[in-house]
Amino acid sequence: MIPGGGQPNMQQLLQQAQKMQQDLAAAQEELARTEVDGQAGGGLVKATVTGSGELRALVIDPKAVDPEDTETLADLVVAAVQAANENAQALQQEKLGPLAQGLGGGGGIPGLPF
């Protein structure tokens, strides 16, 4: 028979799980508030996304606008947004990675990108 019926260990596990859940929620809120940038064309096109990947701003230098070649501009926009999203994913790894390790890896946990 386990002294105390094993209750203290279960209570401790529940408290740890609640703390991890709170830490995860706080990290996700911080990611949603944090903005990261990406650029393309040597800075002619800049995109800003939140740490959770939401596009917030797009700045296009007038030098990048050629009415005869809108395809290149579109490519630069896509590249800038992709670069910003890659930076957001790196930030997610930085902020959420330690929490996922505390949960035994992020595998299968909704909201974790790894």
Swiss-Prot record:
InterPro entries: YbaB-like_sf, YbaB/EbfC. Pfam families: YbaB_DNA_bd (PF02575). Keywords: Cytoplasm, DNA-binding. One of its GO terms (cellular component) is bacterial nucleoid. The keyword rRNA processing does not apply. Its main location: cytoplasm. One of its GO terms (molecular function) is DNA binding. It is found in: Cytoplasm, Nucleoid. SUPFAM superfamilies: YbaB-like (SSF82607). The keyword DNA-binding applies. Gene3D superfamilies: Nucleoid-associated protein YbaB-like domain. Binds to DNA and alters its conformation. May be involved in regulation of gene expression, nucleoid organization and DNA protection. Homodimer. Belongs to the YbaB/EbfC family. This is Nucleoid-associated protein SGR_3378. It comes from Streptomyces griseus subsp. griseus (strain JCM 4626 / CBS 651.72 / NBRC 13350 / KCC S-0626 / ISP 5235).
